[in-house]
């Protein structure tokens, strides 16, 4: 394992030049303190977890120091925000410090969020607050632990530096890791500014470094677009299967690698509500839970438009038509696993949709715990345990009979079924009220709760003695908390 000063950098994106990013030094926050760090994320850089105990660790990730090989850059991009095109966005408070190469030869972007003003700050102060930084850290590591494609978070630092949002808050920084921070909006920026040569350079960079398998295809750019579409379909299927609502699916928040990032007012569903809106700024429900699938398709169409200088329009249209079937196949596969089913039958989609409709009617069923409880006992016994959470008992009993018949046709042993279901159905889920509790403690200077919650959520499928309170249903006050976009 390496020390902080032993990391190896290879800053490929920075070498693209000033058309793609601007050199900016981070603005440090005062008297930095480490709030929480992820040893799992540190391992991606071959970084010794003990390094987090050093004073220099907080200083590095609060903007006070830089590695000699770091080349901090603010990336330029644009994007469609709530359906309207914004011609120039970019990193308004985050900096790509550089790319670290680990022993396996993998490149990891180090992106410091809350690092101060950049040319793209758009009248903002370039800061992030402790509240939003903790939320991003927890979500990044938890989604990864759930098996949902996501950026990673290495640590959060905070300080006494004040920042103003709806009220005065503490400044903080979060260090985000990802193989790339290229977004759909990067391609849109060069397309709409008619910088087609730069568009070509960007695409060749992405192809060579992230989709090299596409280079051997007859049409590498088209193969790359299909790969992006397939990865996005898989990511959205995971969101829907696990009840994750992103909240701000603008094209500048869509990763070219099909990973979840730019966490804002996200939420996991408590009770099932297909129309749940987690962002209180989303007045029309554009980014509601049920809209995430069509919005992902819309965003891919926006990316396709930006690629028209390089790919024939008709071929892009044909590829876009693959999205919904690919999504549905991924989603059904995940839901079969959540229901403990190991084979595919023609009526599986109807079985899943009937269950969700029953959940929607009463909203008394905890979405995550339902699947966990369903695997705890033999199917007939488990159905009796969860039955009282439903309003339409006759409808649930009819569904239960079909589910039992389905399980009997598979003939699984209960021990195997339980182990299989518990491996995909989390006992612990990142609920907004839990995040809010640890945020309030951290704002008061107590970082123990956020560290404990992070540790629990990093093993969401494992029963952890003494941590039962994190597996409980949320109290009524903890449901449907409105989360602001401000961060």
UniProtKB/Swiss-Prot annotation:
It catalyses: L-seryl-[protein] + ATP = 3-O-(5'-adenylyl)-L-seryl-[protein] + diphosphate; L-threonyl-[protein] + ATP = 3-O-(5'-adenylyl)-L-threonyl-[protein] + diphosphate; L-tyrosyl-[protein] + ATP = O-(5'-adenylyl)-L-tyrosyl-[protein] + diphosphate; L-histidyl-[protein] + UTP = N(tele)-(5'-uridylyl)-L-histidyl-[protein] + diphosphate. The active site is at 252 (proton acceptor). Its EC number is 2.7.7.-, 2.7.7.108. The keyword Oxidoreductase does not apply. Its cofactor is Mg(2+); Mn(2+). Mg(2+) binds at residues 253, 262. NCBIfam families: PRK00029.1, PrtAdtaseSelOPseudom. Nucleotidyltransferase involved in the post-translational modification of proteins. It can catalyze the addition of adenosine monophosphate (AMP) or uridine monophosphate (UMP) to a protein, resulting in modifications known as AMPylation and UMPylation. PANTHER family: PROTEIN ADENYLYLTRANSFERASE SELO, MITOCHONDRIAL (PTHR32057:SF14). HAMAP family: YdiU_SelO. This is Protein nucleotidyltransferase YdiU. It comes from Ectopseudomonas mendocina (strain ymp) (Pseudomonas mendocina).
